[in-house]
């Protein structure tokens, strides 16, 4: 199949592109190479994609989507392009309206125009707000804690509206704290490992619990959803809530660096924990990588870059 991925030089997008290419699909990605974090890391991922025979189209979804879509016959498009992260959304909420809501509407309109058979949208566990326990999909009720979460929740509702109005086939993934090699530098585990390897102190904000989900589990689930032509909303997580303080303490002890604690940041929820029964029953999703194993793979990747 011909598969398109927006945000394909991002962490999840590039990993998904490599997986689908390895499975025999013809993959093309579009990315604007924005500077939310180090652009060189995105360019590095893009070079790896190109070395593997994956087309990389540099362009902005708002302006260049027709050119990209018009030159392909995609059987499915994964829409991952967005501004990520809670802290940035507190500083520049209007950018998240533009790049997380309006951009999704642009993709939905294009999916109608170009008759894309199947669309998958990348959402976030942040849409659940401040809740405890293993969360089911119906428990997202709009009681969000940040502009980022509000943008993702709004984009989800646009997807559902277009599915109801126009019959678009849409699958929505709610990702839970995705981590792994070549990840996002603003994420806690990436930051902790970089600092620990450099002998720098680690800082934990609050006492958060996170359902850390390894990148390979995430992309495997996305491929399974593609194979099943799944529609609806699906949690993709590890089903294993872990203490961020414990993860930092383990790294601190291993690399002999101090761990400091600071107040929780505005907009962050205290816990994420996924119930993935819907994904398991619909397309066979079963996460398998433990946090300990995933962190070892990250440490190896970071060491190789020092």
What is the meaning of each model-derived region?
Residues 134, 185-193, 251:
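A glycine/serine/threonine-rich, flexible loop-to-helix segment
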Residues 11, 128, 176-179, 212-214, ...:
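Conserved hydrophobic/aromatic "anchor" residues
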Residues 89, 139-141, 170-181, 191-213, ...:
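A conserved pocket-lining segment of Rossmann-fold NAD(P)-dependent short-chain dehydrogenase/reductase
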Residues 101-109, 186, 216-219, 223:
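Conserved active-site region of classical short-chain dehydrogenase/reductase
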Residues 97, 145-156, 183-190, 211-212, ...:
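Short-chain dehydrogenase/reductase
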